[in-house]
Amino acid sequence: MLKYMWYFVYSIIFMFAERSGTDLDKTDAACRNDREPFMKLTETGYAKINLGLDVLGLRPDKYHEVTMVMQAISLADTITITESPELEVTTDRPELEGGPSNLAYKAAVLMGEFARREPRVHIHIEKRIFLTAGLAGGSTDAAAVLRGLNRYWELGLPAEKLERLGAKLGSDVPFCVAGGTALATGRGEILTPLPDLPPLQLVLAKPQMEISTPWAYREFDKQKNVIHPDIDGMVQAVRAGDVPGVLRRLGNVLEPVTAGAHPEIGEIREDMLAYGAEPVMMSGSGPTVFGFVKNRETGERIAGILQSLCLEAAVAELVGRRSV
């Protein structure tokens, strides 16, 4: 009799334990479903300006041979990468295409092909860099995706390898991988890192227009008596830490082309000088104009005035080279 009683007790205990375990499993599953995605990475994509931009001629491959001093600035997009069943790119700007034509999408596909992995990620881009502005906004987002997937997949690729991959996406992408200050040659993809400049303050303004980079280069090819900036002297000044020497040598051979066709750019330049920014120059093929200021307060005052004139405007500072 005692034997059967113990058997009955053990059966009840076993049933309770089994039921409790099942409930715990259900609870764990519910908790897992409520959790954030396992993988979530955030990258900052800094805008770039050209401190110096010279065009040396047209290459056999139809690209232009350039020599530039490129500089990263703190105006930046935020790129968030999370796990997803399939590759998807979204932005907080409805006018910005997030599908396969987006450079960030192309960067994810390229990285997946290189790593032989499916890029099952959702990439969300919070835009703060002006669109179509000559500030490498799309290129810096693509570079951020390269860095982010390099971290996520633990590939351990150095900056130089990511830069070579980025060159397949666009001429500005290699610089945007690590940023800082750099001499760019070739079509812009051959980089020589330079010492970081101090965090100088600047104000930027963009008129409501878009400039086609191919158009700017085609128009440049028609120019006579081009005044070329002293890129070699600027590089020497950067290496010597001679900030006044750097600022004296600002120059962009595309500015007369774009400003000649769009007088608004010259007007912004004159306004910035009148309000206290100096020196002032257009970045890349335009239309964004930037000017250096003594302090952030001055920059914010000028930006406020320019915004009242229906211009996009922001204050930023120079930022150094990042680790990858």
What do the predicted segments below correspond to?
Residues K40-T44, K48, G52-M68, L155-P279, ...:
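ATP-dependent small-molecule kinase catalytic core of the GHMP/sugar-kinase superfamily
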Residues R35-A133, R151, L155-E163, L197, ...:
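ATP-binding N-lobe of GHMP and related small-molecule kinases
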Residues H124-W153, S171, E278-V293:
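Glycine/serine-rich anion-binding loops at beta->alpha junctions
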